[in-house]
From Swiss-Prot:
Annotated UVR domain residues: 204-239
Domain of life: Bacteria
Functional summary from the UniProt entry: The UvrABC repair system catalyzes the recognition and processing of DNA lesions. UvrC both incises the 5' and 3' sides of the lesion. The N-terminal half is responsible for the 3' incision and the C-terminal half is responsible for the 5' incision.
Domain GIY-YIG, chain residue ranges per copy: 16-94
Protein name as it appears in the record: UvrABC system protein C
Gene: uvrC
Organism lineage: Bacteria, Pseudomonadati, Pseudomonadota, Gammaproteobacteria, Enterobacterales
Annotated source species: Escherichia coli O1:K1 / APEC
């Protein structure tokens, strides 16, 4: 404990009410956030002669100040604790790294409803189904639904401005409600109802209704219609046969935990209406000497209480670990949801099977992560040996991408001891250079990246320059001219030139722009990590360049038309669903866009056609 912090004097002022406490180090940084039913009793436990763990000893040794916030109830304290953890990201708390909102399938409340993926606050009128573990699961489900139930998935701006059906109608993936006369209101509403039932887990009702309609069509000698409905029945059956469905039809989140070598994996199964919508593995940041019980309790609290605005709470949460605050957590979640939420740790039947599945997935994911981490460590150790460095904790790599010198983008990717650190990847739009001058582009991005103050922990051990001797010379010149407070001589600048025919394993490495380079054996672990970070940088640069090129492509042809400024250009693209939709539109359709007169519509039409 810090000599400046008087624990006895502080504890005399602390109340015995519930609340939250924040501990600060000498630099004024919050290093730990906790809650307590009795603040005085809880805080006194930190200053006993025999502390519970090495982690607590290390924490107490750094305490310079403690702030206390009193709350009315223990539930309020729990909510406030997790809000503070999210805000301060204290180093001694278990931290949930991923706090993104989860995607849902959205069925709009329009006259002709559409299906779409939705993330974030649920302001739009309609129905939301989910949550799904990631965007891929939603897109896969939407593609499947489109094959079985052909209701529209287009944006309203496209739907409102069509005079003829699109390709989705031609291939049987949409009933074409945008064009009058293609589908009756009753038929479209029936397909929407099938989607609603299907996403609610009521597959049997969908099949019963479809079979009844098929039999009616057959009796009325409408054999083509009966055959179409038969195909739809078969499609529904194919999908439902592949799913493991619980007989209960409940909404559950099932949480399994694995813990090994100081790393934890928490695996969450999302079950809605008895169907497994998917699952996701999380690897929370765990301070050294942390007990598994703290990992589980903190993760569960952060997972539900920090993201409650964006996350639909299930009726029941299954855990394979006993929580000391289980009742408090259940009460807090019930209060947030406005309904009863159960937290169960000893389920039976199907629920026990789900829990076993989550536990197995957590163990498998953790084993894979540890193996991957071990491989990265081995490769970085090998690289440090090759480069004659004590260690390599952080690497950064740069690449340049452009098309014939236009829309130049530079990328910087970062690797740490665990591999790619994607949260710190950056793209830089390069301007003010001669088109196609890669050397000037590299010079600019390095100055922008390193010509400023950098935290000591962010100074790379190795900076990899993709491009060989010329680009390495630019990097050397930039670093020689840098006037910065951090140690600019710490990073090792390493150039890498692609091999003949750009084949992997034939790269040449350079420490200096002059003289001969050297190569590593194709099976060298050091070469593998160089190839990995270089490929990541290349892909990241190309991705940014493509986005920039697409943006220019979508706007450049409109920018040449007199009378079309940024606002009108944006309105045209929005209402027509992009430049291609605008090219295919008639004068009358263009004139329907707000702010576009008949005369301007004709000018736009002829400009795009010629």
């Amino acid at each position: 404990m810090s000599d400046q912090f008087d624990a006895k004097a502080f504890l005399k002022t602390v109340t015995s009410q519930p609340g939250v406490y924040r501990m600060y180090d000498a630099g004024g940084t919050v290093i730990y956030v906790g809650k307590a039913k009795d603040l005085k009793k809880r805080l006194s436990s930190y200053f006993r002669s025999n502390l519970a763990s090495r982690k607590t000893e290390a924490l107490v040794a750094q305490i310079q100040q403690i702030d206390v916030t009193v709350t009315h109830t223990e539930t309020e304290a729990l909510l406030l604790e997790h809000n503070y953890i999210k805000l301060y990201q204290p180093r001694y708390n278990v931290l949930l790294r991923d706090d993104k909102s989860y995607p849902f399938i959205f069925l709009s409340g329009d006259t002709h409803p559409r299906l779409a993926m939705h993330r974030g606050a649920k302001h739009a009128k309609g129905e939301y189904f989910g949550p799904f573990p990631n965007g891929y699961a939603v897109r896969e489900t939407l593609a499947l639904l489109q094959k079985i139930f052909p209701i529209r998935q287009c944006e309203n701006s496209v739907y409102r401005n069509r005079s003829r059906p699109c390709l989705q109608y031609q291939i049987g993936r949409c009933l074409g409600p945008c064009v009058e006369g293609l589908v009756s209101e009753e038929e479209y509403a029936q397909q929407v109802e099938y989607v609603r039932l299907f996403l609610s887990g009521k597959d049997d009702q969908v099949l019963t209704q479809l079979i009844s309609r098929m039999e009616t069509a057959s009796q009325n000698l409408e054999f083509e219609e009966a055959a179409r409905i038969r195909d739809q029945i078969q499609a529904v059956r194919r999908v439902t046969e592949k799913q493991f469905v619980s007989n209960t039809g409940d909404d559950l989140d099932v949480i399994g935990v694995a813990f090994d070598a100081g790393m934890a994996c928490v695996h969450v199964l999302f079950i809605r209406q008895g169907k497994v919508l998917g699952s996701r593995s999380y690897f929370p940041k765990v301070p050294g000497s942390t007990e598994l019980s703290e990992v589980v309790e903190t993760f569960v609290g952060q997972f539900y209480l920090q993201g409650s605005q964006m996350r639909t709470l299930p009726g029941e949460i299954l855990l394979d670990f006993n929580l000391s605050d289980k009742t408090l957590l259940a009460d807090s979640l019930s209060e947030l949801a406005g309904r009863k939420i159960n937290v169960q740790t000893k389920p039976r039947g199907d629920r026990a099977r789900y829990l076993k599945l989550a536990r197995t997935n957590a163990a498998t994911a953790l084993t894979s992560k540890l193996s991957q981490q071990s491989t990265v460590h081995q490769r970085l150790t090998a690289l440090a040996s090759v480069l004659k460095l004590p260690e390599v904790k952080r690497m950064e790599c740069f690449d340049i991408s452009h098309t014939m010198g236009e829309q130049t983008v530079a990328s910087c990717v970062v690797f740490d001891a665990n591999g790619p650190l994607r949260a710190e990847y950056r793209r830089y739009n390069i301007t003010g250079i001669t088109p196609g001058d890669d050397y000037a582009a590299m010079n600019q991005v390095l100055r922008r990246r390193y010509g400023k103050a950098i935290d000591d922990s962010k100074i790379p051990d190795v900076i990899l320059i993709d491009g060989g001797k010329g680009q390495l010379a630019q990097a050397k010149n930039v670093f020689a001219e840098l006037d910065v407070s951090w140690d600019k001589n710490h990073p090792l600048l390493l150039g890498v030139a692609k091999g003949a025919d750009r084949k992997a394993g034939l790269e040449t490495l350079f420490f200096e722009p002059e003289g001969e380079g050297f190569s590593l054996p194709p099976d060298s672990p050091a070469l593998h990590v160089i190839q990995h970070i270089r490929d990541e940088s290349h892909d990241h640069a190309i991705g940014g360049h493509r986005k920039k090129r697409a943006k220019v492509k979508n706007t450049s042809s409109l920018e040449t038309i007199e009378g079309i400024g940024p606002k009108r250009r944006q309105m045209l693209l929005k209402y027509m669903g992009g430049l291609q939709g605008l090219r295919n539109a008639s004068v009358e359709e263009i004139a329907k866009v707000p702010g576009i007169s008949q005369g301007l519509a004709e000018k736009i039409f002829w400009s795009l056609k010629h």
